[in-house]
């Protein structure tokens, strides 16, 4: 049962506001790397994760965010590299709520190994199409 004091207290505080992310209204956004560095994850995990501090332009303001650099192996990111940022946090890195998209702008580093069973996200064509019964195969 709710008391009178709780009712009056709730009115004084008002409703909770929803937090907006920096990418609200945009699926991805172009940005520039300001700093590329490595950090360690939270307690039970141990690794060296690669992250970048990225500046994006929103209307007339510039905002900074920290984005995770996905994938294995080396990357070619440097300060002032142009990158594409998408949403999606890294669960064991506090404050990292965004990811970088590979194969766009200056972030061209491919992974060391070849993925055989999975097509890439973000409109990368399938180069190895299997021939169907009696039909010609077009490789782009």
UniProtKB/Swiss-Prot annotation:
Pfam families: Ribosom_S12_S23 (PF00164). GO terms for biological process: translation. It comes from the Eukaryota. The keyword Ribonucleoprotein applies. The keyword Mitochondrion applies. SUPFAM superfamilies: Nucleic acid-binding proteins (SSF50249). Keywords: Mitochondrion, Ribonucleoprotein, Ribosomal protein. One of its GO terms (cellular component) is small ribosomal subunit. PROSITE patterns: RIBOSOMAL_S12 (PS00055). GO terms for molecular function: structural constituent of ribosome. It is found in: Mitochondrion. CDD domains: Ribosomal_S12. InterPro entries: NA-bd_OB-fold, Ribosomal_uS12, Ribosomal_uS12_bac. PANTHER family: 30S RIBOSOMAL PROTEIN S12 FAMILY MEMBER. Belongs to the universal ribosomal protein uS12 family. This is Small ribosomal subunit protein uS12m. It comes from Dictyostelium discoideum.
């Amino acid at each position: 049962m709710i008391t009178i004091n709780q009712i009056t207290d709730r009115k004084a505080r008002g409703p909770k506001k929803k937090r907006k992310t920096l990418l609200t209204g945009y699926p991805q956004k172009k940005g520039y790397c300001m700093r590329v560095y490595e950090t360690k994850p939270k307690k039970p995990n141990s690794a060296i994760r690669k992250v970048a501090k990225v500046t994006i332009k929103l209307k007339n303001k510039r905002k900074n965010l920290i984005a995770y650099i996905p994938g294995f192996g080396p990357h070619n990111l440097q300060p002032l590299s142009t990158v594409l940022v998408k949403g999606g946090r890294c669960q064991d890195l506090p404050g990292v709520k965004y990811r970088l998209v590979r194969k766009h702008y200056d972030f061209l580093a491919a992974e060391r190994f070849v993925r055989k069973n999975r097509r890439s996200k973000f409109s990368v064509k399938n180069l190895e199409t299997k021939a169907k019964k009696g039909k010609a195969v077009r490789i782009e």
